[in-house]
From Swiss-Prot:
Keywords: Amino-acid biosynthesis, Aromatic amino acid biosynthesis, ATP-binding, Cytoplasm, Kinase, Magnesium, Metal-binding, Nucleotide-binding, Transferase. This is Shikimate kinase. It comes from Saccharopolyspora erythraea (strain ATCC 11635 / DSM 40517 / JCM 4748 / NBRC 13426 / NCIMB 8594 / NRRL 2338). HAMAP family: Shikimate_kinase. Pathway: Metabolic intermediate biosynthesis; chorismate biosynthesis; chorismate from D-erythrose 4-phosphate and phosphoenolpyruvate: step 5/7. It holds the Pfam family SKI. It catalyses: shikimate + ATP = 3-phosphoshikimate + ADP + H(+). It is found in: Cytoplasm. The gene is aroK. Substrate binds at residues 34, 58, 80, 136. Binds 1 Mg(2+) ion per subunit. ATP binds at residues 12-17, 117.
């Protein structure tokens, strides 16, 4: 069993929104590994970061991704930092991965000063977001089967493009 699509990207790219719409359109279940981590930890991600530290969160995230890839056959959305794990990137190598990219200005606008996004809650969220994009962009591209820019594109239009690609790959026997 493996997901029909795995959605990755930085914070604010629309992973959860697009993932839910995609699952609905394909008639499959949706799963978000951030939700899995919160359920297992019994507390929000921001509290895990502040109380336990980022390394503890990343270990929990890595386990959640591995479990979801093994158990879930619908659409799977991963946390923005999940690609930092070498193990996770290796597991994604054989998966249909959709990388939702977002530009600096749009990403900073979408994420703002959200305290729910602990890595972006600093003094200068735009500079923090740029550093995050610079560090992660090569990793997102490493795991991506497809890359779709989200700036100025409605979620439904993104889903249309993903459905076309997933359907074409299924027809060609590349699931």
């Amino acid at each position: 069993m493996s997901p029909c699509a795995v959605v990755v990207g930085p914070p604010g790219a629309g992973k959860t929104t697009v993932g839910r719409l995609l699952a609905e359109r394909l008639g499959v279940a949706f799963r978000d590994t951030d939700d899995d981590v919160v359920r297992v930890a019994g507390k929000p991600i921001a509290e895990i970061f502040t109380g336990d530290g980022e390394p503890v969160f990343r270990a929990m995230e890595e386990r959640a991704v591995a479990a979801a890839l093994a158990e879930h056959d619908g659409v799977l959305s991963l946390g923005g930092g999940s690609v930092l794990s070498e193990r996770t990137r290796a597991l994604l190598a054989e998966q249909p991965v959709v990388f939702l990219s977002v530009g600096l200005a749009e990403g900073a606008r979408r994420t703002g000063l959200s305290t729910a996004r602990p890595l972006l809650a600093g003094v200068n969220p735009r500079a923090t977001f740029k550093a995050l994009l610079d560090a992660r962009l090569p990793l997102y591209r490493e795991v991506a089967t497809w890359e779709l820019a989200t700036d100025g594109v409605e979620p439904d239009a993104l889903v249309d493009r993903i459905v076309e690609r997933v359907t074409a790959d299924r027809a060609a026997g590349r699931e």
